[in-house]
Amino acid sequence: ELLISYDFHNPITQTNTYFDTENQDVKKQHGAVRIRTIQNKKIFTLKIRKDEYTHYEFEKEISAENINEIEDPEISNWFNQYQIPKNLHPTASFTTLRNVYAFENGELCLDKTYYKNHTDYEIEYEYTSDHDGIHFFNSILEKYGLKWVKNCPSKIARALND
């Protein structure tokens, strides 16, 4: 019902590969290092936990095929600033079919994600600017008898447990 209520355009297929050290140094900081591939475009992402509900997210398009081939000074600065080691290796990978509807301050995302051993569905609201996103997201969900509660593991956690 939610999918047909908004003018979602062509779904996007994206593959996410997450990286960490053998000692899970990134995970210990409640962070994530990811390369997202959409068609031939690769986007590097560093997420660092700000508080219980929010992460800082740094993104930059890259041309490197492998995490260890990235030689971008800005990305190196993020790694140094947040003490992210450079000896990273892939820890999980999955593909998501994402439908996106843009609002003024964020995007409503309906995801169907294919993991190694299962498929799941998720509704997300991703901020594009600072605002009371939780309240706004719940106002959308209310119309369908739903309410957002932090009740499920993240996609990376689900992939690691797959």
Where are the regions a protein language model picked out?
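Phosphate-end processing signature that detects enzymes handling 5′-triphosphorylated RNA
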Residues: E1-D162
